[in-house]
Amino acid sequence: MVHGPGESLEPDVKRLTFVVVLLSVGVIVSLSGQQPSFRAGVDIVSLNVTVTDAATHYITDLEEGDFLVFEDGIKQNVTFFSRRQSPIALSLLLDSSASMEEHLSVLQQAATNFVHKLKSNDIAQVIDFDSRVEIRQGFTGNQAELDTAISQLAAGGSTSLHNAIYIALKELRKVRAVNEEDVRRQALIVFSDGEDTSSLVSFDEVLDLAKRSETSIYTIALRGSDVQAKGFREAEFVMRTLAQETGGRAFFPAKIDDLNGVYTQIADELASQYTLGYTSANPRRDGAWRRIVVQLSRPNVTPRTKKGYYAPTVR
């Protein structure tokens, strides 16, 4: 089944409810049962996979057998698969630096429209950043509270982009599941109109934390009049790299009025993902980077997920 941007998505379900985190506890999922079981000492690698065709339409009718997962070139045994989307814990980062003054109302409206697309069991936080980073609203499922937080943005100051992403990733780490009903996919959506100018945290530190997280990062960088300027090239590199490494997507709208459509595309993507998980065939607990490749048996479609993960270390 093919879904284009803006369509209502009601993916079929293979009922397996447990996703992501709890790596320190470990999860074993029985493909024949309704609920996963927990087993200490087992580490599950969880993947949120987006599949598109050549026209970038989302493909939502694939089966478990259509997916092949490789870690460092070795085929892995998929132990859970689901087309049903678990709830989301979402961090919404909004650039409120001085250069955003004339565009801020459009950004606020687009961000508000986006949070209204969240489901009742999703939670989100709102962070705005200029020369400082402020958590306007902690994680909540209350849309009125999210609306209020977005409406409070005021433009001023420089751009602490790296600081904001770093803090948001740290906040997402605090969203811990007590049981399988509490488990959430994690996503971070960051909008900025320029390069970082005032962060204390380096891009390398941000990238390392992102690669160690379970978070898909979606980046939106507004193109200025001079896309060849050094500042924009640096911002584009940061935004594109974070998205590619974490299985998210980078957007570079030419006009601020394109923002609403961009946020709609992100909402559609989050509603179209598959969740796969496996226990690595590599038993070493060496903390090394392990590269992941997902392939599909169906021709002319492309999967996208995070590039890899760091192996656990000895407890």
Please state what every model-predicted region is:
Residues 17-30:
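Bacterial N-terminal signal peptides
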Residues 10-16:
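Positively charged n-region of N-terminal signal peptides that target proteins for export
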